[in-house]
Every structure is written in structure tokens, then in C-alpha cells.
Amino acid sequence: MKFRNMTGINLKIAIPTNRPQAVVNYINALAQLDSHGEAGRCFNPSDYDGLLLPGGWDVNPSRYGKDRIPQETVDDDLDALQFEALDRFLTAGKPVFGICRGHQLLNIAFGGTLIQHLPCAGNHTSLPTGEDNVHRTRIEQNSFIHLIYGAGCTVNSSHHQGVEHPGKGLRAVMYSEDGVIEALEHDSLPVWSVQWHPERMCFSHSRNDTADGSLVFRFFLEQCQKRK
């Protein structure tokens, strides 16, 4: 997929969080593409071009009908503000992109469920050195992620949960080698997500052993620009 020149695009992207310091990598990636990511608790969708749901702690499993397990770390305040932001932006018809926790939260919002602790979690969590694991993926044709990367690519991995059943209208379009759903897209709404961390695969965080994560941000910004 060939992307347009992002110079001067100057889009505003809302990033709902209660820990602004935790979303710096997302803001920096957007800035490299001449766009502004704004961290905060509450947003008016009319003031923004899109919503980015970032990585973070686990979503409380009570939101998808399950009990907590010892391996989970939840933040109910973060859940509340992000679900509220998502509802507002969906109602406004604005593009939404989820990353890691954001990918899982989107799935829950559409009625899907999560695997609370992957049997293969060791293959997907960070290494003892703090570096992300990496793995190959298989990508479905006729999907947003196939337009970007083709039939497959190598991505990073830093999570212990995964999508179990996709929510209403969501389609799984990318899988890890051990079957974990690595990307979702909605069949009619401007909604996309990935389980991995493209912000740690681009610009100053580029890696020789993974795909270029900036292409995900370019895709999202193009979709936001088209809907201005």
C-alpha cells in the first residue's frame, strides 16, 4: 500500500489515559507524521480527527462476564474513561484504532471476550532483558493489515491475554503462528486494532527483525484525513 505524504497533515488524535507518561511513544510516533497526539481523560470528539486506544493494564474481566484471576492487573478508572471515550467517538463516527490493551478493549466493547491468560503466554510476553519478543504472523486477504504488510510479517509481542471470541461486526484478520488473534477490523465502522506495539517498531524504536510499525500509524492517519 502506498501512503500519501504526511507533511503538514496536522491531525489531532485523542489518547485517553490516566497516565500521560505511559503514552509518550504513541505521541512521538504521531509527531513524526506531522500529527498531534493528546493525552487526557475526557475529549469532545468534534475537536479531534480520531481516537487511539493505547496499551496498558488488563481490562477488568467483569466487563465481559468473567471473574478476575491472579495473573491480572486491572485499573477500573482507566477502564471507565476509555470506554466512555470510545462510546463518544463511535457515536460521532470518528475513526478508532486500538493497540494491545486497546485492541482487547475494542473487542469487549463490541461484545467479545478475552482469553485471560494465554497458554502460550511465554511466547508473547517481554524477554527477561525487557525487550519485546518477536514472532511471525499470517494475514487474511481483503483486510486493512493485508493492504499494509501483505500475506504476513514479523511483529513484536508483549502481552499475556488475547481475543477469544471477536465482538459483533469484528473480523479477525491476522494471527500469530500459535493462533493468537493479532488484528481486528470492523465490517462497517472505521475501527481497527492490533495486538502488538507498532509504536515500538518505528522511527527511533525501529528494529531490524520486525516490520515497519510506522505504516500502521500512516494507515490510521490516512483514514482520519479521508473523514475530515
Sequence positions of predicted segments:
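N-terminal beta1-alpha1 cap of cysteine-dependent amidohydrolase-like domains
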Residues: 1-97, 101, 108-109, 115, ...
